[in-house]
């Protein structure tokens, strides 16, 4: 199995990079792992709704270019489905059983995700109603992916 995480924007904070690197290394025991950072569009101060939509579409096209036809795509969106960690683990396991060899997670930029990206998704997941910086969400996501694998393997990490 291959896990891809496609994100918009460059990660600058060392503590987040270190955490992501640690969990990426741990995930690699279970699956091939790849983090893809795409450049974000500069959003003007007090941008109009049409300017925001144009930015979303440009970023959306960049995201879609990184998704293969056979990828199972999971977008992170506040309106998505919430899971307990055990349910999330089961979802990932079932996706693999259904024959998908690549799981692609998508984290949008500060404006979110375009409708074209959301429409391409096989599943929309929410980690709750809280608003988190998308940079921090990367770390939360890779930790939960690692946790999902440890649940599947019966490791004591998840208690």
UniProtKB/Swiss-Prot annotation:
Which keywords does this chain's UniProt record carry? Cytoplasm, Methyltransferase, rRNA processing, S-adenosyl-L-methionine, Transferase
InterPro entries in the record, alphabetically? Alpha/beta_knot_MTases, RlmH-like, tRNA_m1G_MTases_N
Q: Gene3D superfamilies from the entry? A: 3.40.1280.10
Q: Which family does it belong to?
A: Belongs to the RNA methyltransferase RlmH family.
Function in brief: Specifically methylates the pseudouridine at position 1915 (m3Psi1915) in 23S rRNA.
Enzyme class per UniProt: transferase
Where, by residue number, does S-adenosyl-L-methionine bind?
A: 76, 108, 127-132
Its gene? rlmH
Quaternary structure and interacting proteins, as annotated? Homodimer.
Primary location recorded for the protein, binned into one broad class = cytoplasm
The record's Pfam families line, in alphabetical order, gives:
SPOUT_MTase
* Compartments, record wording: Cytoplasm
Q: Lineage, please?
A: Bacteria, Bacillati, Bacillota, Bacilli, Lactobacillales
What cellular component terms from Gene Ontology apply here? Answer: cytoplasm
Q: Per the UniProt record, which EC number(s) apply here?
A: 2.1.1.177
Catalytic reaction equation(s) = pseudouridine(1915) in 23S rRNA + S-adenosyl-L-methionine = N(3)-methylpseudouridine(1915) in 23S rRNA + S-adenosyl-L-homocysteine + H(+)
Give the NCBIfam families listed for this entry. Answer: PRK00103.1-3 (NF000985), tRNA_RlmH_YbeA (TIGR00246)
Q: Does the keyword Thylakoid apply?
A: no
Query: CDD domains under this entry?
Result: RlmH-like
- Protein name as catalogued: Ribosomal RNA large subunit methyltransferase H
